[in-house]
Amino acid sequence: TGSTTEGNVYVLAMGNYNDISAKVQKIDNMNVVTDVTEATLMTVKDNTLYLINAPYGATANTYFSIDTKTGNETKNLIDQPVDSPCGIAVNPFTGNIYISSYNMVGGWPSYTTDGYVNEYSANGKFTNKYNVGVGPCGLTFLLK
């Protein structure tokens, strides 16, 4: 979940991997729930949702952002996709985007080998790759 400066709460509902797709829903300050978009991973910085839609079995994943004030969507959020995304975070100080991934083994995500995190500039240009441990699905930043 994440919240924006206008006080809305955004919820990532994962669906059932069958006939109900994962989606983002908004709870506004009047407690009204509305569907926003399909996505499987989400983070928020200021009034921007950073989203990945990587449903099970998909042949391609989408990386995009939505300005929560205007509703405008930015497609192709990053210039170099990861193999099998499992986490996303945005540095609250720099705006850099971090996406974690499983490595692929035999054409499938490996849940037993080390994964990695790609770092992108705030405008989505790949800057660095970090090899990390197994299942790197959670990323966060500590505020001082």
Q: What does each of the following model-derived ranges do?
A:
Residues 1-28:
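Solenoidal tandem-repeat scaffolds enriched in leucines and small polar residues
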